[in-house]
Structures are given as C-alpha cells and as structure tokens.
Amino acid sequence: MRGETPTLQDYVLDLQPEATDLHCYEQLPDSSDEEDVIDSPAGQAEPDTSNYNIVTFCCQCKSTLRLCVQSTQVDIRILQELLMGSFGIVCPNCSTRL
C-alpha cells in the first residue's frame, strides 16, 4: 500500500491456485524376514527383571518363610499387594497337614 488512503487494488491479489500432489511415493524396504523376528516372542524386548528376597509368614502357623523370586518391579508390587491382603503362603510343614 502506498499513499494516504487504501484502495481496493491494494487488497485484491491476483493469485492462481496451484495443484499439489498429495501422493506419497515413499517405498518401504521388503523386510518380511525381519517382521517374523520382531513379531515372535524371542524378538521382543525382555522386561527388566531382578531378584527379590521376600520374608513373610506362614498363614497357618505364623512361622517365618523366606522366598527368593525373579520378577519385574511391576509384578513384585502386585505380589506385595496380594501378600498384604487375603493371599497367604503356607509353609511345607503346614502343607502336609492340609
């Protein structure tokens, strides 16, 4: 815009629409062998597991029980919630009397 007052010609643009190609020409490599490896259980990433020492009591005689388990952190928290609830572990002596 030049001048003190705007004119309509200052706002009207003389543009023509352009056609845009929206097709994707990307080609993926043929990896049918790799997909089989990834989809198989052996190809999946193993969750991080650790060894845990658990000390709890027999739900029958209240004797001390020591367990060593290998688990993920998420699963060990689930076990902790079970042990704090109604879930109980029985010692070998009490298991023969059941």
Swiss-Prot record:
Keywords of the record: Activator, DNA-binding, Early protein, G1/S host cell cycle checkpoint dysregulation by virus, Host cytoplasm, Host nucleus, Host-virus interaction, Inhibition of host innate immune response by virus, Inhibition of host interferon signaling pathway by virus, Interferon antiviral system evasion, Metal-binding, Modulation of host cell cycle by virus, Oncogene, Transcription, Transcription regulation, Viral immunoevasion, Zinc, Zinc-finger
Pfam short name (any one): E7
High-level lineage: Viruses, Monodnaviria, Shotokuvirae, Cossaviricota, Papovaviricetes
CC annotations in GO: host cell cytoplasm; host cell nucleus
Motif window: Nuclear export signal: 76-84
Stretches for region E7 terminal domain: 1-40
Gene Ontology biological process terms, A to Z: DNA-templated transcription; symbiont-mediated perturbation of host cell cycle G1/S transition checkpoint; symbiont-mediated suppression of host innate immune response; symbiont-mediated suppression of host type I interferon-mediated signaling pathway
UniProt keyword Iron present: no
Assembly and interaction partners: Homodimer. Homooligomer. Interacts with host RB1; this interaction induces dissociation of RB1-E2F1 complex thereby disrupting RB1 activity. Interacts with host EP300; this interaction represses EP300 transcriptional activity. Interacts with protein E2; this interaction inhibits E7 oncogenic activity. Interacts with host TMEM173/STING; this interaction impairs the ability of TMEM173/STING to sense cytosolic DNA and promote the production of type I interferon (IFN-alpha and IFN-beta).
Job of this protein: E7 protein has both transforming and trans-activating activities. Disrupts the function of host retinoblastoma protein RB1/pRb, which is a key regulator of the cell cycle. Induces the disassembly of the E2F1 transcription factors from RB1, with subsequent transcriptional activation of E2F1-regulated S-phase genes. Inactivation of the ability of RB1 to arrest the cell cycle is critical for cellular transformation, uncontrolled cellular growth and proliferation induced by viral infection. Plays a role in viral genome replication by driving entry of quiescent cells into the cell cycle. Stimulation of progression from G1 to S phase allows the virus to efficiently use the cellular DNA replicating machinery to achieve viral genome replication. E7 protein has both transforming and trans-activating activities. Induces the disassembly of the E2F1 transcription factor from RB1, with subsequent transcriptional activation of E2F1-regulated S-phase genes. Interferes with host histone deacetylation mediated by HDAC1 and HDAC2, leading to transcription activation.
Chain intervals annotated as zinc finger (unnamed): 58-94
UniProt name for this protein: Protein E7
Short motif (LXCXE motif): ranges: 22-26
Mod. after translation: Highly phosphorylated.
Effect the entry attributes to changing residue 94 to A: No effect on the binding to HDAC1 and HDAC2. Reduced copy number of episomes. Impaired production of late transcripts
